[in-house]
């Protein structure tokens, strides 16, 4: 279905285009640029919501609202955007989290104009990744969001920000090279004219050896972004040094690009290779759940502890993608949405706590619950959501992945038992490191010599941000059908591919 007005093009280009006007705003103070950026994000979020409510059909599993314009004629490079059940929930998540991250960044006063422009540029890049239907355009959008993150980290990070920023760009740039090489190989293989759009690539047939090589190239790139063990080491450093508004974008949106890429490209375009690699992806996902949980427990730094918990939770996404069941893949989508909300909330609360106590080391904290009861209550609620308390979105997501893999007919009983055991151990470990984090932060005697005047409780702005996050976290937990219909039709279509219906590793 092609749209009359290019709505998807508008929501993709509007943030970065509006950001180019920031230098022309009144340079006195930061108030104007804050409100300007927030209004731009709100407008984009409202239009995205309008697309979902009035233009998007939940019962169609093919692309909708397609914007297709020839860009570079000689190589058939098109500006082609489209939305379906994989991209719709993620562009809604992107718009929602970016708007809240912009509001959370209000305390920033140094070079605020550049900061807010970079946030808007990153906003456009992330929307572009989820909406692109051309492999070369997908690569360009993938690259577009890297530059703002590097600058946000290197200019507004902690003491080791340059090390973290360099490590981030090296990891992700290497992954991007694999996307470009594999994408161009797919486009030019057995074709006089390059076929760059996803629909054409899905209809191509490759020799199995070539498909395996292509799959491996994309897998490396997306495993870095997810991040998957052992390509995860950039994430704790990045989260540990970035400003918490940047962390909200990293945890809420950026790492979801890896899971999205695995489904959109590896699973849909290279299904034969996906069958071969799926047991290994599931095994790595199970190991990653336990590794992330155990490593998180050993972290003294609050943000690094939350970062390793993110690595652990992304293991469920990998298992869901490898399950070959509607329920498992739907659970992977739910986990990406759920963790996007919960992860953003945890990093926001970690940042607001740091603004008051000026330390991130858990062994230096303690006893601040009585002076900051609202922050204590919000942190506790968010941690309970992360450990998959029933009634929260995290519980629904992990249960769907757990049951989805358990009912899979693709694997032997022994392999299913192994992965289920790894998941169960991870689920047991999660409360240990999260409740330990709460105990070290809020209970016991106060170790820091801070007066009560410095330990201010949550402001109305901070309460509003967390309330906005808690609303979908609890809403999805109580009534999962708020989100499942967004991707259910598409998930069923993917799992009905002939290649997947005949899978069996007995």
Curated annotation (Swiss-Prot):
TM regions (residue ranges): 5-25, 35-55, 88-108, 114-134, 135-155, 168-188, 209-229, 243-263, 275-295, 309-329, 331-351, 386-406, 415-435, 463-483
KW Transmembrane helix (keyword) present: yes
Membrane topology classification: Multi-pass membrane protein
Reaction catalysis annotation: a plastoquinone + NADH + (n+1) H(+)(in) = a plastoquinol + NAD(+) + n H(+)(out); a plastoquinone + NADPH + (n+1) H(+)(in) = a plastoquinol + NADP(+) + n H(+)(out)
Keyword Transcription: no
EC numbers, comma separated: 7.1.1.-
BP term (GO), one: ATP synthesis coupled electron transport
A GO molecular function held by the record: ubiquinone binding
InterPro entries named in the record: NADH_Q_OxRdtase_chain4, NADH_Q_OxRdtase_chainM/4, NADH_UbQ_OxRdtase, ND/Mrp_TM
Keywords: Chloroplast, Membrane, NAD, NADP, Plastid, Plastoquinone, Quinone, Thylakoid, Translocase, Transmembrane, Transmembrane helix
Protein localization: Plastid, Chloroplast thylakoid membrane
Domain of life assignment: Eukaryota
GO cellular component: chloroplast thylakoid membrane
Cross-referenced Pfam families: Proton_antipo_M
Record-linked PANTHER family: NAD(P)H-QUINONE OXIDOREDUCTASE CHAIN 4, CHLOROPLASTIC, NADH-UBIQUINONE OXIDOREDUCTASE CHAIN 4
Family of this protein: Belongs to the complex I subunit 4 family.
Protein name: NAD(P)H-quinone oxidoreductase chain 4, chloroplastic
Species per Swiss-Prot/TrEMBL record: Chaetosphaeridium globosum (Charophycean green alga)
